[in-house]
Amino acid sequence: MAAETLNFGPEWLRALSSGGSVASPPPSPAMPKYKLADYRYGREEMLALYVKENKVPEELQDKEFAAVLQEEPLQPLALEPLTEEEQRNFSLSVNSVAVLRLMGKGAGPPLPATSRGRGSTRSRGRGRGDSCFYQRSIEEGDGAFGRNPREIQRSQSWDDRGERRFEKPARRDGVRSGFEEGGAGPRKEHARSDSENWRSLREEQEDDGSWRLGAGPRRDGDRWRSTSPDGGPRSAGWREHGERRRKFDFDLRGERGGCGEEDGRVGGGNSHLRRCRGLDGFEDDKDGLPEWCLEDEDEEMGTFDASGAFLPLKKGPKEAIPEEQELDFRGLEEEEEEEEEPSEGVDEERPEAGGKEATPLPPPENSSSPSSLPALGPLWTTNEEGGEAVEKELPPAEGDELRGLSLSPRISSPPGPPGDLEDEEGLKHLQQEAEKLVASLQDSSLEEEQFTAAMQTQGLRHSTAATALPLSHGAARKWFYKDPQGEIQGPFTTQEMAEWFQAGYFSMSLLVKRGCDEGFQPLGEVIKMWGRVPFAPGPSPPPLLGNMDQERLKKQQELAAAALYQQLQHQHFLQLVGSRQLPQCTTLREKAAMGDLTPPQQQQLTTFLQQLQALKTPRGGDQNLLPTMSRSLSVPDSGPLWDLHTSASSQSGGEASLWDIPINSSTQGPILEQLQLQHKFQERREVELRAKREEEERKRREEKRRQQQQQQEEQKRRQEEEELFRRKQVRQQELLLKLLQQQQATNVPVPPAPSSPPPLWAGLAKQGLSMKTLLELQMESERQLHKQAAPREPLRAQAPNHRVQLGGLGSAPLNQWVSEAGPLWGGPDKSGGSSGGNLGLWEDTLKSGGSLARSLGLKSSRSSPSLSDSYSHLSGRPVRKKTEEEEKLLKLLQGIPRPQDGFTQWCEQMLHTLSTAGSLDVPMAVAILKEVESPYDVHDYIRSCLGDTLEAKEFAKQFLERRAKQKASQQRQQQQQQQQQQQQEAWLSSTSLQTAFQANHSTKLGPGEGSKAKRRALMLHSDPSILGYSLHGPSGEIESVDDY
């Protein structure tokens, strides 16, 4: 019988086989599923015959075909990439696929991850293995027809015509057997159509023996169930189930070409089939099996993404799982039909079969009861526990019976394609087999025992999922969900859940939880609680413990709000630190933290800070948030306040956390809104405070600048007054010196005019009075002076000085020149014409110095008042005649206090040029600039006068450079002047003694000789910078010089 089952397909197709031995590796296990008509060619055959370079036949190049002829032939759809719309259709949800199946539209969209007729390494059908489409010859026929689901979807017309040859591979798509009852029919139909071809051939050739009977010995011996592909004992893992189903699948297909097709075609007899199905040990078959049957059990454990693509956890390629999906699809059906044989691991493996397929479509919300079974297999594929985890969610044995019982209607639900007798015969045969399976299910006590044992082994895992897993557990951070049947599915990684969520598989009412959470919660509530999609990347809150009373829930919500509020405060604190407003920051933060909160909220905030201290080592994703906030809020590391743990932090044995309780969305919303309003209000108040501070700061700066300017002006004025006072003193000393010299030059007494009475002490001069009598006379003349002018203190301070100085020169000469100088000390000018020579000198000197002191109005100086009055008495009418010249000189001196140098002229010129408004007081600005010491103040003053322009900045820079040079030169000149002044003082003291001595003996000389001597004495070396002018000749001409 085995040999007969290898003879399949039409004779002409088998005749195409080129021979060859079984030892040569088959290009790919073939799987013919139909007896081909004479002119029906398989898809792969046509692809193999397709040559891209072929030109259009000449027969078609006629004009009558020109309207419909296209020069460039279109490539086969199998060679075309999928469009975006097709990709989108392939990622439809399970509901859409189920509807398509119910409508007879086929298996629905396949998985994008599978190859589309390109013969990838893991592709299904006859082409599995390492071969690809175009490595095989025509002899393979249509064997790989149903291998690639995407090829199917390229042309639905085949499916519409009822040719289900393409639909078996569609099991690779996201549709899982457990997710639809209606879809189970087409699924069964796939298996039926897959097997109808060889069955009809075999029935035609000899007896009606069932292909199921071929597998009978294998089932009786349970050989393939008890051993793994590598001969070792099996574990209860889903891979074991997959291997078992795979072998069964393979054997079924072996009859159709899985391993026997080559033998059938090349005439190799039944030796290969014997290897595949014989009773002599499964290990002997390994060399004849495809590589997908020989892999390690845990090689391809993994998960599926939203599109159904397999994400291996270890080293399996992505195509491996679509292959598994197809195998699992078949294996599940055939296993259901085969459950009359109670065996180990059947129940353990069955749910995994569907579960593996169910993974990409997690929430089967409209699926039938069996859907919950397969849905949980992959739950544990990510862990090494493998098999034990699978049975955790197995339904009771009644579920198995129900599923088995439902086989019969599912088998018969889709009618076979009309007109296909082989399909009809296959349907009848499968119905008979299903009835046998149903009968066997009713007395499968061994399976019930195995199921009970499996449930016991998974009891711990089940309880762990129901309660919170410790954080150290591998699945603590993975996700579980409850399907509509109440079964728990999982664990799934966050990435998987995110992909399924994006694909639209999850409704907001889906109950989800993490391994570390205690209870399930609707997905919508979790999103509200987390403030984001929980499957999106980001820090995850600590475990949510569900057995908390309402009081603690409320308190935890308040703490969460306080934490959020403190986070906002921390952000403001950092902003204020960045803006260097630390002094105001502390007060502001305290106000914001306490002033805006009600007393209960303040208490909650204090409680939260205590929790921060208690939770120095938070769990999970909070390891960064709370310590950072604790540091930012200056929470002390120790202290009596922080050593108090609240009940909320101690209830869970030190593991309490801010997130230990789910925050109710109804209370979260108002709290968040209130916090947002407070945040906005605080920002607005902060802006106002900042503006107010800036305004105050600006006012303070302006006031400081104004005060500084006033101080500078006051200092400038004082310096100018001091300078004028100093100059006045120097000029007065110089005038006294001149007067002394003049008296000495005219030491010959001139007889007074008869009409002019002599001075008070004129008669006493010749008698050689003592100094005491002289002083008394001088004091008497001073009393007369007080009668003529207002009494002034400086007169009594300085007049004795001059008298002491002059008195030290000797009594005789003093009597002589003091008698002539009476009017200087306030005596009445009664000398008339006899003093005309004196008047001529005063007229010259008053032009330069004497009248200046009076006109400048230095009333506060110590010596200027009496001297100016003396000058007016000495000069008399000639001085009044010079008033116009004095006024001109006064204006000049008032405008320019000191003679201008080159630096001052340059400053004024530049300021006139740069001053656009014309209202700038240039001399005053120059004077202020010259007195300002700080470069910053110079820049500030120039900016206030001229504006913040490049020209003003350049002027300030040049001004500072020139002023520095000028000051350096001034220092050098001052040093020279000090040296010269010292020399002059020494020389002047000696010269005064000499002149006094010469005056004392001048009576021995003639008038001409005496005048010559005095004229020589007039050649004094005076410092021009002190005097303001220099004397170069005996006539006493005045020449102005610069001060600098």
Curated annotation (Swiss-Prot):
Spans annotated as Disordered: 104-290, 306-424, 692-721, 820-842, 855-883, 966-987, 1000-1019, 1024-1044
Modified sites of kind Phosphoserine: S24, S28, S137, S157, S228, S343, S408, S540, S634, S863
PROSITE patterns in UniProt: GYF
Lineage top rank: taxon: Eukaryota
Keywords of this entry: Phosphoprotein
CDD domains per UniProt: GYF
SMART domains: GYF
PANTHER family: GRB10 INTERACTING GYF PROTEIN, GRB10-INTERACTING GYF PROTEIN 1
Family per similarity comment: Belongs to the GIGYF family.
Basic and acidic residues bias: start-end ranges: 148-179, 186-203, 237-265, 316-332, 389-403, 692-706
Organism: Mus musculus (Mouse)
Role of this protein: May act cooperatively with GRB10 to regulate tyrosine kinase receptor signaling. May increase IGF1 receptor phosphorylation under IGF1 stimulation as well as phosphorylation of IRS1 and SHC1.
GO biological process, one term: insulin-like growth factor receptor signaling pathway
UniProt biased composition (Low complexity): 366-379, 855-877, 970-984
Every GYF domain range: 476-524
The name this protein goes by in its record: GRB10-interacting GYF protein 1
Subunit structure: Interacts with GRB10. This transient binding is increased under IGF1 stimulation and leads to recruitment of GIGYF1/GRB10 complex to IGF1 receptor. Interacts with DDX6.
Tissues where the protein occurs: Ubiquitous. Lower expression in skeletal muscle, liver and testis.
Gene Ontology CC entries for this record: protein-containing complex
Acidic residues bias (residue ranges): 333-350
Bias-annotated ranges (Gly residues): 829-839
Gene name of the encoded protein: Gigyf1
